[in-house]
């Protein structure tokens, strides 16, 4: 079996810049949605791309495109699958040093994960490193 890479924390979260990643297929209104139409046609395909959302985006600024979850609950409260408001509170309280300017979303249904691992993840990691991210939280749905 492959070894899972592990990087231990060197600072407490109160000193870390934190990124959030959701698998709920979240995207900004006006931006390209995740390709769930292709997924409808090809049930063994899942969109391996990602979307970047500014942290200032509000509940009404985003949309959800996911065939495998009921997104109606997200439209009422995004924090169910992507606790942005909770982490902004942590930032105000000093529990984290900062929340990144960019928040990330991918699809949770990606049967062929090679494009995600070889293309999407490196792009996301490069962006996070550029923002000085020291910890990332993944919220799978």
Question: At which residue positions do the language-model features occur?
Answer:
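Metallocofactor- and cofactor-centric catalytic cores in central/energy metabolism, strongly enriched
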Residues: 1-141
């Amino acid at each position: 079996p492959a070894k899972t890479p592990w990087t231990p924390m060197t600072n407490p979260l109160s000193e870390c810049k934190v990124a959030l990643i959701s698998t709920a297929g979240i995207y900004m209104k006006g931006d390209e949605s995740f390709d769930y139409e292709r997924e409808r046609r090809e049930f063994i395909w899942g969109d391996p791309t990602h979307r970047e959302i500014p942290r200032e985006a509000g509940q009404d600024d985003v949309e959800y495109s996911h065939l495998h979850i009921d997104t109606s609950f997200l439209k009422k409260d995004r924090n169910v699958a992507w606790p942005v408001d909770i982490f902004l509170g942590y930032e105000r309280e000093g529990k984290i040093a900062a929340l990144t300017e960019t928040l990330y979303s991918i699809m949770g249904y990606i049967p062929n994960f090679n494009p995600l691992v070889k293309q999407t993840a490196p792009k996301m990691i490069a962006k996070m490193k550029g923002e000085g991210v020291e910890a990332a939280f993944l919220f799978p749905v």
